[in-house]
Amino acid sequence: VRLLTTVTALRCYLQKVARENQDLINSQGLVFGDQTNWFKTAVGLVPTMGNLHPGHLSLIERARRENLTVIVSIFVNPLQFAPHEDYHRYPRTWEQDCQLCEQAGVDAIFAPTPEIMGVVNTSSETQMVQVTPPSAMISGLCGRSRPGHFQGVATIVTKLFNLVQPDRAYFGQKDGQQLAIIKRLVADLNMLVEVIACPIMRDASGLALSSRNQYLTVGEREQAVVLSQGLKQAETLFRAGGVRNSIELIASARQKISIVDDVFLEYIELVEPNTLIPLAKIQEEGMLAIAARLGSTRLIDNTILRDRQPIIAIDGPAGAGKSTVARQVAEQLGLVYLDTGSMYRAMTWLVLKADISIDDECAIAQLANESTIKLTHSLNRDHPVKVWINDYDVTQEIRSLEVTSKVSAISAQSAVRRALVIQQQNWGKHGGLVAEGRDIGTHVFPNAEIKIFLTASVGERARRRQQDFKKQGQPEVSLEQLERDIAERDWKDSHRQ
C-alpha cells in the first residue's frame, strides 16, 4: 500500500494510475473506438478518520470488489469537532490502520495533516472557504447539539472529492444524517462521484460498530446494546404490527431504552432518510434515528423502515437465464417484472436509429438523458414485457443481432447507466418488483430484500442464446461465434467503469 501525505504525492500517484490504465488498454490491442467498450478503470474512495474497525473494513471490502484502484483517506478533521468535544483524544492508531489497509488490499492511503488540508488551527472556519449544507438538513438530529459539525464534514469531504476525483465514494449508513447531507452535496454541486451507502455493521450483541465504542467500559458496552434493541422493538412493531405513525414507533423505542437508567437520550426522531424532514407517518420509508450518551461517550444509531412490497434483484453474466428466472419469479409471486436488460437494448436501438457512433459518448449521454423508457405488460409469453422508448414500441427490434452486438458497448457507458438507473430506482420506490441485470443488487437496488446471483458456463449460455435466436427467427449463428461474443461481453462487463 502506498502512503501519501501531500497533495503533490496524491496527484502524482493518480497520474501514474491513469498512465497504467492507458497502458493496459494499449496492451489489449484496442483501437480508439474500442475504448468506449472498455472504459477507464474506476477509483474508489473510502473517507475515514482512522482507528479502523470491521465497519470501515466492510466499506473497503466493497470498494475493493467494485474498483480497480482503492484509496483510503485517514484524516481526523478538526472542523467537525466543537471546542468541548474529543478531537485531541480521538483514537489515532496509525500503524494498525496501515496494517489493516494492507491486508484489505488497499492501493493507497492518503493521510494529510490539517495544514495540508488548509486547516491552520481549530478556529480556521473563519479563515477558509467552507461548504454549508441546507440549514434544514443540519439544524436537526445531531446538528442540534453539534453546531458547525456538518459544515466541517461537508468542507473536508468536498476537498477530498476534488483532490482524489473518485468514481465512487463509500459511506456507512450508521451516520445517516451525514450520508444524506453528502448525497445532497454531490447532487447540488453536480459532482461526478457516486455515493455508495453501505449497511450498518454490528457486533454479536447488536451494538453498532464505532470508533468511539472503545471509550466504553465493559459494563457500558453491555448497557449500550439497549439502543439497537430499542430500534429493533420499533422495527418489529412496524413490520408485524403495521404501525406507521411516529408517535407509537418512537414511544416503543423509548420504552425499551428506558430500562437502562445510565443511558441519557439526546433524541429519538423519525425522519425521511434523504431530506431529513421529520415524519408524522411513514408513507414510503423513514429513518428512526437515535443519539444517546452513556457516561462520557456519545453514541448514534438508526434503522431504515420501508413501507413497500419486497424487491428481488437477480444479477449475473449475460445469457445466464436472468430474464427467464425473473419472469417466472414475478409471475409466481404476483410482482412486477422490471426488465432492465431490455432498457439497455432499447437505448442501443435508439442510438443505432439516430445513426450515432457508439464511441460518441457525449451524444449518447445527451440522448440517454432526454429519453423515456416505458415497460408495459404483454400477453405474449415469449415477450411478456412490451418495451417503449420515446413512444416507439421496440419490443421486437431490440432482439436483433445488430442490437445484441452493440448493447454491451452502450451499457458500459457510465452516463447511460446513470440515466437508466434513475428511471429504474423511480419504479422501485414502491417495491413489489423483480429486477434483473448486471449490478442490479449492488448499484440499482442495494436495499433489495432478496438478492440472487445466477450464473452458467459460457457454453451453456451460448446454447441458450442460440435457441433464443431460433425462436425469434433470427439468422443462424454458430455456437463458437456465440461463445466468443459472450466471453468478450463478460470481459467488457468486468472492466467497465
Show where each model-derived region lies.
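Conserved lysine of the Walker
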Residues: K322
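Walker A (P-loop) phosphate-binding loop of P-loop NTPases
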Residues: G319
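Short beta-strand-centered segment that lines the nucleotide-binding/catalytic pocket of NTP-utilizing
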Residues: L333-L350
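Small-molecule kinase domains that catalyze NTP-dependent phosphoryl transfer to phosphate-bearing small molecules
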Residues: A111, Q424-H430, R438-H443, N447, ...
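Conserved nucleotide-sensing/catalytic segment adjacent to the nucleotide-binding pocket
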Residues: I356-R381
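Nucleotidyltransferase catalytic core that binds NTPs
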Residues: V1-V271, I277, G286
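ATP-dependent NMP and nucleoside kinases share a basic, alpha-helical "lid"
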Residues: F161, A180-K183, L189-M191, T395-V407, ...
